[in-house]
Structure formats: structure tokens, C-alpha cells
């Protein structure tokens, strides 16, 4: 039986990556800082996943355990494991890099020269390549050549909506996920044998799929959230069932889709079907996904390589329509959430320096650009 160490025992870790690994007969050790969660997982060594779509089913995931990600034990697990995966959030990758580096160093010192593959499963472009840079900062330079030879840092694109568990459920380990899932990996970056895991698709053209997901699912999801907030909707489903919001979100995804079609040669009809599938996923009656969860961290989401600005830059590159994307960005600026430090910082900036300077600061768009002027106009109309 193959072994994997998975950083992040949260809903995505358990409901998506951990489940696919366990279903492929891989023994999964979750690593997390949440001590009660680690204790429950290591005690029960199984958990339930409720898969909801046109039909609902409950699967039991077995052969799992957990360790504290700040412990020496997780380093020892990396010494022996076949695979390391993560679902910790982009901001936490830099924190776990040191632990992974210590594990690699100890692995080499112990004489384990079997290939090790590491896959960051995060909502970021080339997240594993970023993680590699951070790991190498903590790895002695004398080990870099050996790591280049034996450790594969495999970029991936992941897609599955996993909302927070409902508090009414008395099983803290159970997680609800949608039936749709997509995990695409860059086949060229593996070292040694490429693992065979049902649900993990291999490709030589990862960026096409990374951007397809970022420009469609992520772009549409956050615009639904930001427009939904402005209309007083609580959940993504409520928001997308508002015809005006649904139309706006669909138009924004068609604008970003035009960039994908021109950049990567996606089939137009197939991409339109992909957009419709995503709209249907947002309306899934079994998923209670709050607009505040999807809209949180607006400063990160307004970054130049993220879900709003990157597709906009593509429309500028190809000279294509972008009015609905611009409106989505304006709606993001309107997002208010006192419990989200980024939302608070964004509102403070808008009050202190205004729309144009705030956009220039956080998005890298030029303050005097046509796009920034249009966003300011739309912002004032919302």
C-alpha cells in the first residue's frame, strides 16, 4: 500500500484530495495544526464524506490517520512517504515549506533515495513551483542537486466546491462535497513512476486547464458572491438564482472564456457547455455556500495573477469585451466584512485614497488606464 502525507485536514483536504487518495488505496496521513481535529482523525482513522449532486451518497474514507504538522512526527512521515500533497490555502504554503525541507533532508540522510513527488492542490497558478522555491530556501544548498534529481514538484489544477460543514451535524469529521471534481496534474514534473489515482488527470498542457478553472469557476464564483452581497443574498445559490446576477456572471465568464478560446484554442461550444455546468454547480440545492466564504480575502482576489485581474488583462491583450468583468471588479471593491482583515483594509484604502489609487495599489493596473476609469464609474453606479 502506497503512503501519502497530506498537509491540511480541513474540508478540502478530507473531502477532495484525501478522499481520492484513499479511494486509490493510498494510506493517508493528514498533517494539521488543529489539535482536536488531529486527535479525532488519529483515533477514528476514518470519516464520512457526503457527496451531493443529482443523487446523494455517503462514502466512508478509511486507512487514514493524522499528526500535528508542527511536530517531529510529520518530518519522520516525510522520510518514508511516497507522496506529499497539500490543501492548506496559498498563504500557508510558505509556512509548511520549512517542515517539508526538513523532511527531505532527513529522508536523504536516512538513505531513502526513492523518488518523492509533492503536489500542492491550491487555488493558485503553479502553486507547487512556488512551494519549491520556498522549500529550497530552507534546504541546505548542498542538497539542491539531489532534490532536483529525486523530488518532483508537480503543479496541479483542482476544482471541487467544498463548503464548511453545517453546525447542525454532530459528526465533526463528516464533510459535504459536490459530486463534480477535477484534479489535473502536470505529467512532465513527476520523478519516477507517475502514480495511478482515479480522478487525477495527467496533462502536458496544465496552464490551459489552470486558467480555464481560474477564469471560469473562480471568476464566476467570486463575482456571484460580490454581486450577491450587494443584493443582500446570503448564499451562492440564492445569488445565482437572481436572474440579473446569473446573467451578469454568465456574461463575465463568456468574456474571460473568449480569452481562453483565443489563447489555448478551446472549442467554443464545449467551453460554453463548461460555463453552463458551472452555473448549475453554483445552484446546487444541497450545497449551502455562504457569499462571505467565497468573497473573503478580496485583496488577494484582486491580485494581478488572480481570478479578476488576470482574465481582464487577457481581454486587454486580445482587444475583446470586458464590461462585465469590470463590473465584477467594481463589486469586489464594494465588499464589506468586518471579520475579514483584507475587506477592512480594502475599505480603509478606498476611504483614504479613493478608487483609482486603491486599484493601482492592489491590482497593478495603471491608475490612468481606461479600465480603471471604467471601474470607478461602475463602482459609483453600484
From Swiss-Prot:
Chain sites annotated for binding NAD(+): 4-15
One cellular component term from this protein's GO annotations in UniProt: cytosol
The reaction(s) this protein catalyses: D-mannitol 1-phosphate + NAD(+) = beta-D-fructose 6-phosphate + NADH + H(+)
Keyword Oxidoreductase listed: yes
MF GO annotations: mannitol-1-phosphate 5-dehydrogenase activity
Pfam families, alphabetized: Mannitol_dh, Mannitol_dh_C
EC number: 1.1.1.17
Keyword tags: NAD, Oxidoreductase
InterPro entries attached to this UniProt entry: 6-PGluconate_DH-like_C_sf (IPR008927), 6PGD_dom2 (IPR013328), Mannitol_1_phos_5_DH (IPR023028), Mannitol_DH (IPR000669), Mannitol_DH_C (IPR013118), Mannitol_DH_CS (IPR023027), Mannitol_DH_N (IPR013131), NAD(P)-bd_dom_sf (IPR036291)
NAD listed as a keyword: yes
Gene Ontology process terms (BP): mannitol catabolic process
HAMAP family the UniProt entry points to: Mannitol_dehydrog
NCBIfam families given in the database record: PRK02318.1-2, PRK02318.1-3, PRK02318.2-2, PRK02318.2-5
Entry's family note: Belongs to the mannitol dehydrogenase family.
Descriptive protein name: Mannitol-1-phosphate 5-dehydrogenase
Designated gene of the protein: mtlD
Amino acid at each position: 500500500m502506497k503512503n501519502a502525507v497530506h498537509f491540511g485536514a480541513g474540508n478540502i483536504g478530507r473531502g477532495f484530495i484525501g478522499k481520492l487518495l484513499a479511494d486509490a488505496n493510498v494510506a493517508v496521513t493528514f498533517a494539521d495544526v488543529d489539535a482536536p481535529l488531529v486527535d479525532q482523525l488519529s483515533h477514528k482513522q476514518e470519516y464520512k464524506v457526503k457527496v451531493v449532486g443529482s443523487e446523494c451518497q455517503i462514502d466512508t474514507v478509511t486507512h487514514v490517520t493524522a499528526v500535528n504538522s508542527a511536530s517531529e512526527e510529520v518530518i519522520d512521515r516525510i522520510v518514508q512517504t511516497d507522496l506529499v500533497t497539500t490543501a492548506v490555502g496559498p498563504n500557508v504554503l510558505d509556512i509548511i515549506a520549512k517542515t517539508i525541507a526538513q523532511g527531505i533532508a532527513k529522508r536523504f540522510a536516512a538513505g531513502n533515495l526513492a523518488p518523492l513527488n509533492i503536489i500542492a492542490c491550491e487555488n493558485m497558478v503553479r502553486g507547487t513551483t512556488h512551494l519549491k522555491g520556498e522549500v529550497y530556501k530552507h534546504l541546505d544548498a548542498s542538497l539542491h542537486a539531489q532534490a532536483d534529481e529525486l523530488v518532483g514538484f508537480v503543479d496541479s489544477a483542482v476544482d471541487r466546491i467544498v463548503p464548511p460543514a453545517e453546525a447542525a451535524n454532530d459528526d465533526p469529521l463528516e464533510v459535504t462535497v459536490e459530486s463534480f471534481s477535477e484534479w489535473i496534474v502536470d505529467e512532465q514534473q513527476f520523478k519516477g513512476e507517475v502514480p495511478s489515482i482515479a480522478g487525477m488527470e495527467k496533462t502536458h498542457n496544465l496552464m490551459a486547464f489552470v486558467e480555464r478553472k481560474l477564469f471560469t469557476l473562480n471568476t464566476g464564483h467570486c463575482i456571484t458572491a460580490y454581486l450577491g452581497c450587494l443584493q443582500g443574498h446570503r448564499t451562492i445559490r440564492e445569488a445565482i438564482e437572481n436572474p440579473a446576477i446569473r446573467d451578469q456572471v454568465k456574461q463575465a465568464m463568456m468574456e474571460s472564456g473568449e480569452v481562453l478560446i483565443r489563447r489555448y484554442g478551446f472549442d467554443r461550444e464545449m467551453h460554453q457547455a463548461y460555463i453552463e455546468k458551472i452555473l448549475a454547480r453554483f445552484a446546487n440545492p444541497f450545497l449551502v455556500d455562504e457569499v462571505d466564504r467565497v468573497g473573503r480575502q478580496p485583496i488577494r482576489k484582486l491580485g494581478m495573477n488572480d481570478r479578476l485581474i488576470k482574465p481582464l488583462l487577457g481581454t486587454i491583450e486580445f482587444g475583446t469585451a470586458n464590461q462585465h468583468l469590470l463590473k465584477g471588479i467594481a463589486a469586489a471593491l464594494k465588499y464589506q466584512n468586518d471579520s475579514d482583515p483584507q475587506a477592512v483594509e480594502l475599505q480603509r484604502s478606498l476611504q483614504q485614497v479613493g478608487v483609482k489609487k486603491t486599484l493601482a495599489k492592489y491590482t497593478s493596473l495603471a491608475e490612468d488606464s481606461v479600465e480603471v476609469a471604467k471601474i470607478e464609474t461602475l463602482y459609483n453606479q453600484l
